[in-house]
């Protein structure tokens, strides 16, 4: 009996330790969706439509951008010394084949997850890494946004390899800020999701699930 109790206690300890080394960003519930900050991109004709769904792996967010662009943001502190890795499970059902995503006229992505560090008094001074699910570029491609040098697009997934299927990816945000922005960031200030097609005037459909930070 004593050995069984010790085994149970040890299992609970390991479970708690595992949870302590993860920070979930979104629950993807109707209640959460109603509280998230929605920002329409300046000049866009319409907002991206976001809805909640559920599958065997839990809740997910569906994004439909039809000549539209708006993001969902959450101000949240992330300790990058403790949990430097972002984990994203996502899927693109309808992509944006043929556009030049690294130009102003084609700067649309079927799915994006931004990580944001405040570096000044206004949002325009913030530094961001824009992890994207590209329709045309290759994994690990990166380039500064054609609209602002303070945001860098980094390709984590591409529909050339994974189209209309769930895929989980991981990135070391702390190291990426060092490499891309030359900044040693100890704490993030926010995370945002966006699907946008306002430049290409096309339609994209994507899904997001299980976005969290981890220690490894």
Which functions belong to the PLM regions below?
Residues 20-43:
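Extracellular carbohydrate-recognition regions
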